[in-house]
């Protein structure tokens, strides 16, 4: 997979690409990440890429020509172009899976200042937001999107690890514990020490449903539960009701 990021702050991504799973994926050639400095496509001798807003308004807007010229150079018939924008669809695990599985070439455009000239939208396949809040620029959001996608590329991390992550199955992950077994009078649940894999799996399934119900009940609205999960969920609701 090739990911190309268009930004006015190319150095922002250096440490991101030099650490952890991203670095491993790059070293293993599971992914290529190319950073493009938008200023290099400026038609201004001072490499200016922003200008005042037509009709008046506060702040500066990223210009259309640099983005257009950059896309003319790097876009291919296989490319998908996304613009990081507060107006975009909220990025989620479903989208991450879709891009990791079906997009050999992804181009990410980072907005800044007051946004981008609206004419670039003609060349964008999807606008994406990472949440209903304001960031200084699209670079932080780009690292979120790239990290979520890259870790799903086959071979980057163990399949079992990615498969069991929160949100991957539409639910939050069950609680996890490590040594010591007892600390500050807090004990690891005994079932996890039993060695009974069936009981452990049942416990994890129930805890996953319970945590999702308590912390992110909205996830259960569109989640297609199995018959077993439906029974467990009703048990959880009754237990919580009895303990309230």
From Swiss-Prot:
A GO biological-process term: tRNA N1-guanine methylation
A GO term for molecular function: tRNA (guanine(37)-N1)-methyltransferase activity
Catalytic activity: guanosine(37) in tRNA + S-adenosyl-L-methionine = N(1)-methylguanosine(37) in tRNA + S-adenosyl-L-homocysteine + H(+)
EC number, UniProt record: 2.1.1.228
Keyword entries, A-Z: Cytoplasm, Methyltransferase, S-adenosyl-L-methionine, Transferase, tRNA processing
Top EC class for this record: transferase
Cellular component, GO annotation: cytosol
Subcellular location: Cytoplasm
InterPro entries named in the record: Alpha/beta_knot_MTases, tRNA_m1G_MeTrfase_C_sf, tRNA_m1G_MeTrfase_TrmD, tRNA_m1G_MTases_N, tRNA_MeTrfase_TRMD/TRM10
Chain positions recorded as S-adenosyl-L-methionine binding sites: 111, 130-135
Gene3D superfamilies: 3.40.1280.10, tRNA(m1g37)methyltransferase, domain 2
Entry keyword S-adenosyl-L-methionine: yes
Pfam families, per the entry: tRNA_m1G_MT
Subunit structure: Homodimer.
Cited PANTHER family: TRNA (GUANINE-N(1)-)-METHYLTRANSFERASE
Family: Belongs to the RNA methyltransferase TrmD family.
Role played: Specifically methylates guanosine-37 in various tRNAs.
Protein name, per record: tRNA (guanine-N(1)-)-methyltransferase
Gene: trmD
